[in-house]
Amino acid sequence: NNKFLDITLKNDNNNKKKYLEIYSDLPRPLLSEYNFFKGLIGGTLTFSSVIELTETNSKLTIENFKIKNAPGLVKLLSLADFGGLADLAEGEGLSFEKLEMIMNNNKGFLKLEELYAVGPSISVLMEGYKESNGLISLRGTLVPAKNLNKFISKIPVIGKIVIPKDVGEGLFGVSFKIKGMPGEVKTTINPIKTL
């Protein structure tokens, strides 16, 4: 099958830190405990983490993957009235070119400092936290049709005024909030947001 998994752990005894690095072209089993990654297909994963006594700072990157039959994402797309994308997510899956996630874990409090995922049909920006008791609180923006926004950004004057330079940001989006305890998570949508 020619799948690879490379794990490196280095100790820095002077600074009381450990450095963990993981590379794999089979990311799904490594992320199976996280609901957010249910339905992940394919992709290559790079994960790096600096582990201190009570705190861990990590960065996760996944490239060239699909999300298929992920209930949370399908629900979010349906609530946002992106019906066609919800159907695609349930059918052949939504493609993404890149996902990057930066997080900090301090004594069981997980802070998602930034998550962005960029794909040809939709991009996602998100931040939030998960408490040690299981409570999650996330907020973010869904931006459909990256290609349309790319097209507009190429119009010299309009593009500079309207389109921010950040990856994943576009002209029109939908803001969302996800909050609650496991099994009682509520999702709310703000239907139209101009970024």
Please state what every model-predicted region is.
Residues 1-179:
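Small-residue helix/turn framework positions
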